[in-house]
């Protein structure tokens, strides 16, 4: 696998099998709304202000710059739980030193509003959120397509979704992972944050490719015979039987890394039959590799073989990255939808755990690449 020479953008496989659904989606402030859900309640005391803001068509960094220019707080002294995209309307939380509170009394900006102010002991850090609630409005939806959307949503609600990294991770042209690979090869870059982002994009690209390979395996396990699975994956008859026996779409493998869902430690899948029950109950999920020296190692068998197919040519860079694990399979929570036939609008709302992308869910539903 020669990533440097690839000229096309890799397109991960979908878990659902329906044909593409016609709908118009624009990531504007009326049709795409994100609401952060904090990880904890704010105490009401301490040396930090927590600002609940609503930004429209601004990145988080652009919002911080506006607040910095108004309050005099250095950008590095602000805290946030997650970086949000420019497009759409976002309700999120930021922290800043309380001593600058007076500078906010007359704050006014057409794209940025301060809705509430709390106090707390700690500065907000990346990851200090439970997840995000999303509102998406699709337009120009015919009744026949609305029925297809409903069926796709019911299927995802029942089975879960592929927790790919979204197109936002990979830059304007979808290939900034190549720059990350160049840095790992020795290319110099002074901007430390950009350097880290590009290397992260490289890790994310490999994660997506491995997850896509697991989706392919799951489709094959559902559609092919034991004999065919043995021929394709060079596995034993017993392993093929185990795959065919699993009723859920995403197939677990003995020896792979699992994690307690949605927050929890990693462990190896040693007793497959026991872990399948916990997986179906959504207590655990499979964890894909973000390559690096400190990532939890896969055990053995087909899980390791499939992983090696993706990562074998990049092992020389392993020591240059910290590495970790990420859930490959996630679940929609608090899902609801409504269809307005007169306006031809189809509205969807759901909650995702932190780190998951609403655009990935939308691409799965529509079977369209939003990047294009």
UniProtKB/Swiss-Prot annotation:
Active site: 85
Keywords for this protein: Isomerase, tRNA processing
Listed EC numbers: 5.4.99.27
GO CC terms in record: cytosol
GO molecular function: RNA binding; tRNA pseudouridine(13) synthase activity
CDD domains: PseudoU_synth_EcTruD
Keyword tRNA processing assigned: yes
Superkingdom, natural source: Bacteria
GO annotation terms (biological process): tRNA pseudouridine synthesis
Catalytic reaction(s) noted: uridine(13) in tRNA = pseudouridine(13) in tRNA
InterPro entries on file: PsdUridine_synth_cat_dom_sf, PsdUridine_synth_TruD, PsdUridine_synth_TruD_CS, PsdUridine_synth_TruD_insert, TruD_catalytic, TruD_pseudoU_synthase
Annotated TRUD domain residues: 160-330
Disulfide bonds: none
NCBIfam families: PRK00984.1-3 (NF002154), tRNA_TruD_broad (TIGR00094)
Main function: Responsible for synthesis of pseudouridine from uracil-13 in transfer RNAs.
Family that this chain belongs to: Belongs to the pseudouridine synthase TruD family.
Name of the protein: tRNA pseudouridine synthase D
Source species of the chain: Campylobacter jejuni subsp. jejuni serotype O:23/36 (strain 81-176)
């Amino acid at each position: 696998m020669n990533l440097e020479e690839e000229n096309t953008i890799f397109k991960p496989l979908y878990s659902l099998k329906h044909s593409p659904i016609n709908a118009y989606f624009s990531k504007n402030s009326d049709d795409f709304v994100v609401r952060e859900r904090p990880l904890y309640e704010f105490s009401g005391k301490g040396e930090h202000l927590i600002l609940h803001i609503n930004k429209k068509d601004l990145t988080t960094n652009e919002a911080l710059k506006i607040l910095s220019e108004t309050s005099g707080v250095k950008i590095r002294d602000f805290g946030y739980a997650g970086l949000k995209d420019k497009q759409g309307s976002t309700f999120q939380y930021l922290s800043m030193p309380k001593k600058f509170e007076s500078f906010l009394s007359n704050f006014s900006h057409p794209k940025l509003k301060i809705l509430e102010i709390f106090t707390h002991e700690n500065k907000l850090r990346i990851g200090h959120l439970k997840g995000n609630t999303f509102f998406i409005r699709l337009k120009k939806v015919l009744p026949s397509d609305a029925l297809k959307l409903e069926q796709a949503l019911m299927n995802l609600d029942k089975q879960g979704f592929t927790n790919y990294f979204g197109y936002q991770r990979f830059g304007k042209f979808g290939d900034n992972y190549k720059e990350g690979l160049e840095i790992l090869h020795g290319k110099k870059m002074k901007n430390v944050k950009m350097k880290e982002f590009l290397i992260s994009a490289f890790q994310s690209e490999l994660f997506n490719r491995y997850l896509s390979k697991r989706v392919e395996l799951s489709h094959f396990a559902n559609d092919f015979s034991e004999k065919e699975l043995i021929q394709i994956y060079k596995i034993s008859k017993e392993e093929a039987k185990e795959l065919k026996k699993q009723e859920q779409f995403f197939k677990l493998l003995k020896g792979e890394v699992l994690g307690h869902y949605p927050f929890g430690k990693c462990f190896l899948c040693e007793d497959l039959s026991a872990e399948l029950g916990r997986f179906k109950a959504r207590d655990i999920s499979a964890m894909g590799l973000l390559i690096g020296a400190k990532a939890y190692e896969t055990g053995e068998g087909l899980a390791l073989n499939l992983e090696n197919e993706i990562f074998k040519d990049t092992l020389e860079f392993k020591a240059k990255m910290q590495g970790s694990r990420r859930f490959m399979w996630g679940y929609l929570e608090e899902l609801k939808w409504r269809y307005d036939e007169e306006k031809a609008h189809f509205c969807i709302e759901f909650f995702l755990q932190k780190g998951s992308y609403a655009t990935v869910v939308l691409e799965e539903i529509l079977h369209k690449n939003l990047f294009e």
